């Protein structure tokens, strides 16, 4: 498979730096380009703000400054064998956009870089990302442990849809002790799943605690980092193994595209637990016996998700959606900072209002998760979402919603406009109290 990564080939001229001058730079800051995908430069020593703009795609002389939209389903080859090598996963290249596309891969490379991962894949929605992230290493007869305070759609995915596929899930309190979380594990448990900041309860995850329990039981920790974004938190730095996103939210920021992402840290040792993860460590007969961990190393997990799940299930985002997502990513740090500062002011206002009985926002010093936010989030920031309860209960909430003038009632968060949602009436309507 073809993956957007940095491989040293030839030096390129960029920002007035000649190839001869760049040759004297340390390897960590040398401007280099990839042999297969033009224009990628190593961004490890750059600030996240710079990565949001430059990572994933940097044009060479005479090439477009903006990321091109490769609006094509197929790709030309000159011989039968050339294309055959691609289908056997023995060569790099593109052959069908349902699996991979140059526009999509450039944006995936950027998100992987922002999270500090080794590889990433984009999906057509955040729900598709979470489905693939779990299903890539689970099958009928397996078991998942998940935090109970997660997005309602993800809760139903794990509790209902996966059950139909023969995969059971046990939910644990996010505030549970390590011993209590570990008690939920079974011999067939394959995944521990949680959200960095729970949607919509805004519970802040103790990532190190969950990572320790996961690794003590020989499973990876998958963390949905949608609400925090890599601007505020990078879960890999705290022990998480795989990160997912609904890129529809802050990464897009303008409510113009639906998408998701899965990023692999490359840190989980699948071979050490090969008896559990045989889909990665044993021959895949649908690809002439390829063993993903042997052939693709740290990129085994993402390669399997791309070559197997995308092949069979689809859920690839359109190149145009990825182009729009990339535009959003370029301003992500600026927007997240302003989202958080605005949310902080509103949370403080609501917290002092007589008709508000409770405010959930970890930026408030008295919030239950304030200390965790200070530990895991940059500058203690969390996100631009606030949840609060009115003194009149559900009826008061409905009256409040129906009286809004400027704010919009919508099933969304993290756009440029203020949106208000009543979870009990909308996103979590299928759940009980």
Give the location of each predicted region.
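PLP-dependent enzyme catalytic core of the Aspartate aminotransferase-like
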Residues: 1, 31-32, 40, 159, ...
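N-terminal "arm"/small-domain region of PLP-dependent enzymes with the aminotransferase-like
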Residues: 41-101, 109
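Conserved C-terminal alpha-helix-loop-beta "cap" of PLP-dependent enzymes
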Residues: 336, 344, 348-351, 355-433
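Conserved PLP-enzyme active-site core in the AAT-like
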Residues: 44, 52-58, 120-352, 360
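Short loop segments at secondary-structure junctions
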Residues: 74, 265-268, 390-393
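Intrinsically disordered, low-complexity segments enriched in serine/proline and basic residues
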Residues: 5, 9-11, 16-27
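Short Gly/Pro-enriched turn/cap motifs at secondary-structure boundaries
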Residues: 59-61, 251, 314, 376-378, ...
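Conserved N-terminal alpha-helix of the aminotransferase class I/II PLP-enzyme fold
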Residues: 79-131, 153-161
